[in-house]
């Protein structure tokens, strides 16, 4: 039914333009003002449909951006982690402090926690020199930090997009109900009032 918004608009405009039936329409409770109100309901639905379409597009884009940011952080972290571990393979305490002990995490929350721990401790004097010699420079750590922040922002945008979709869907559905309730009543009146004038009903698409 929602997809019939355009057809509803065509019907209402055809009725508004039909001067031959104007007097009977007004007498039946459908003066120009009421028909204009009906057209306003149709325009409100069109606006709500556009909002829903935009929300769908925003959510799709947000999901795509999140996947890209997720992959970028995983790839960068895996490289930095491997280089960092190679500097402290015989120092379990250092590995623990830097968040490098055990297997590489796969869960994103664990990865983000491990990245945060590495970024906090890598600049400390006990670790910075060795890490730099293995290629884990300040610039490389800054790059990792940027990837982490990009993922956090992508997550925020994704959640915002997800929460927006139900709201605009409810708005669309409410607008559709108001319009089509109005249209059902109008069509019932029109069929009764103009049952002897099928040509008029045909002009209106009823």
Q: Which residue stretches match the model-derived regions?
A:
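Basic/polar low-complexity intrinsically disordered segments
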Residues: 1-206
């Amino acid at each position: 039914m929602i997809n019939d918004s355009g057809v509803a608009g065509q019907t209402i405009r055809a009725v508004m333009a039909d001067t031959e039936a104007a007097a009977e329409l007004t007498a039946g409770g459908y003066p120009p003002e009421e028909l204009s109100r009906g057209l306003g309901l149709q325009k409100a639905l069109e606006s709500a449909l556009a909002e829903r379409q935009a929300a769908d597009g925003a959510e799709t884009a947000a999901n795509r951006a999140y996947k890209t940011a997720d992959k970028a952080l995983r790839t960068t972290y895996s490289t930095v982690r491997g280089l960092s571990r190679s500097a402290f393979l015989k120092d379990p305490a250092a590995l623990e402090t830097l968040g490098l002990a055990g297997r590489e995490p796969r869960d994103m929350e664990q990865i983000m926690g491990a990245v945060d721990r590495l970024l906090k401790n890598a600049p400390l004097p006990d670790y910075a020199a060795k890490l730099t010699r293995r290629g884990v420079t300040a610039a490389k750590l800054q790059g990792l930090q940027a990837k982490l922040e990009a993922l956090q922002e992508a997550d925020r945008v994704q959640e915002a997009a997800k929460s927006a979709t139900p709201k605009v869907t409810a708005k669309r559905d409410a607008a559709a109900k108001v319009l089509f309730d109005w249209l059902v009543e109008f069509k019932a009146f029109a069929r009764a009032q103009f049952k002897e004038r099928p040509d008029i009903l045909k002009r209106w698409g009823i």
